[in-house]
């Protein structure tokens, strides 16, 4: 890397740091951290453990953002100092090392910039992710199980925890429907980019004639809400049914009616939970999911009204694919919203989804 190129990169990073400091309101964040840390010193801080954990989580999230900014600023300053040393006493080996470190630092800047884009009111929340196969029976149900694995692997790469809240296996293969609770900082902020129809084109392993098949799966993503989020759900509007849980592959099947299904009668929204052995806990989880779905429903309605005002028509049917995964006659995964595409289909199916999310978030926040 030439000296002039290194200088240009460092100047660009300096400007990015200025923009980050302004957009992050770092002074406010630092004041909030001090406020939370003071709250942690109260003698009765741990009396309400759930509230205490929320305070700790908020503090850790703010600290992570501030510390990462400071780390980038420090690395940038180190780069400036090293560049001056090289200009005073040219050293080819040191220059090469600096060029490599600048390239790595640029990647860190890009990753941090993506995290800054997650500034929605619930972006930091855990996520509820649902997969529902379209028409096509076993073929589309198998596609749903492939996407299930993809998102599980993606969550693992982010260090998030994945819980299967509801699972309905396919009769021959795959899944008829599955609901995941994904626990991690910014889980909803990232995964909201995956909401939509996912299309698969491949030679079906279930077709003895070896014909090419097209399958569809709907992915729905909602933020998980804390109990203190006020979303009005009247008891008289609910129908609550219990049934026996049936785990994936027939495992962990309860002999009592611990699984819970809640129907919100006015809207027809239905949620189910069977992950816990306790009916009470399943009901609590189902109510959280119901609130999330009702919130998402309201957001979708607001978006629909905005689209009408703008004269835009949004197709919410199976024709509105957000992404195509083509395994035959060639290999390609393409996002139709951003036109970002890759040829490494196996890598994507193994959880390399972040580049698609990155492209989508950058486009929608421009």
From Swiss-Prot:
- Mind telling me what this protein is named? Peptide chain release factor 2
Keywords, comma-separated and alphabetical: Cytoplasm, Methylation, Protein biosynthesis
Q: Does the keyword Protein biosynthesis apply?
A: yes
Q: Does the keyword Cytoplasm apply?
A: yes
What is this protein's function? Answer: Peptide chain release factor 2 directs the termination of translation in response to the peptide chain termination codons UGA and UAA.
Q: Which SMART domains match?
A: PCRF
This protein's major location comes to cytoplasm
**Family, as annotated:** Belongs to the prokaryotic/mitochondrial release factor family.
User: What's an example of a GO molecular-function annotation for this chain?
Assistant: translation release factor activity, codon specific
**Which SUPFAM superfamilies does this one have?**
Release factor
Name the InterPro entries on file: PCRF (IPR005139), Pep_chain_release_fac_I (IPR000352), Pep_chain_release_fac_I_sf (IPR045853), PrfB (IPR004374)
N5-methylglutamine (modified residue): where?
Answer: 251
Q: Which organism is it from?
A: Exiguobacterium sp. (strain ATCC BAA-1283 / AT1b)
Give the gene symbol. Answer: prfB
PTM summary from the entry reads: Methylated by PrmC. Methylation increases the termination efficiency of RF2.
| GO annotations of cellular component type | cytoplasm
Where, per UniProt, does this protein localize?
Cytoplasm
Output the superkingdom of the source species. Answer: Bacteria
Question: What lineage is on file?
Answer: Bacteria, Bacillati, Bacillota, Bacilli, Bacillales
């Amino acid at each position: 890397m030439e000296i002039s190129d290194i200088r240009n990169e460092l100047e660009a990073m300096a400007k990015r740091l200025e923009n980050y400091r302004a957009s992050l309101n770092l002074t406010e964040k630092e004041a909030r951290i001090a406020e939370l840390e003071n709250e942690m010193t109260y003698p009765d801080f741990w009396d309400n453990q759930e509230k205490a954990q929320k305070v700790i989580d908020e503090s850790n999230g703010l600290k992570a953002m501030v510390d990462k900014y400071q780390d980038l600023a420090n690395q940038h300053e180190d780069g400036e100092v090293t560049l001056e040393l090289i200009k005073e006493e040219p050293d080819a080996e040191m220059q090469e090392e600096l060029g490599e470190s600048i390239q790595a630092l640029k990647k860190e800047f890009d990753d941090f910039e993506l995290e800054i884009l997650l500034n929605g009111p619930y972006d930091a929340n855990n996520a509820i992710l649902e997969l529902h196969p379209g028409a096509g029976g076993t073929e589309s149900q198998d596609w749903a199980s492939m996407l299930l694995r993809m998102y599980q692997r993606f969550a693992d790469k982010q260090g998030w925890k994945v819980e299967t809240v509801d699972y309905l296996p396919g009769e021959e293969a795959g899944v008829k429907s599955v609901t995941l609770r994904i626990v991690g900082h910014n889980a909803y902020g990232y995964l909201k980019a995956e909401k939509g129809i996912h299309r698969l084109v491949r030679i079906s392993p279930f077709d003895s004639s070896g014909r090419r098949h097209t399958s569809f799966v709907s992915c729905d993503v909602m933020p998980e809400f804390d109990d203190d989020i006020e979303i009005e759900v009247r008891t008289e509007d609910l129908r609550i049914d219990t049934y026996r849980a049936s785990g994936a592959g027939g495992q962990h099947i309860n002999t009592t009616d611990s699984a819970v299904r809640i129907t919100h009668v006015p809207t027809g929204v239905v949620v189910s939970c069977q992950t816990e052995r306790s009916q009470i806990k399943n009901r609590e989880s189902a109510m959280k999911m119901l609130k999330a779905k009702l919130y998402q429903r309201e957001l979708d309605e607001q978006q629909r009204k905005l689209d009408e005002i703008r004269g835009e028509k949004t197709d919410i049917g199976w024709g509105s694919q957000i992404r195509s995964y083509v395994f035959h006659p060639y290999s390609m995964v393409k996002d139709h919203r951003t036109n970002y595409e890759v040829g490494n289909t196996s890598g994507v199916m193994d959880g390399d989804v972040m580049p698609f999310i990155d492209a989508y978030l950058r486009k929608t926040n421009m």
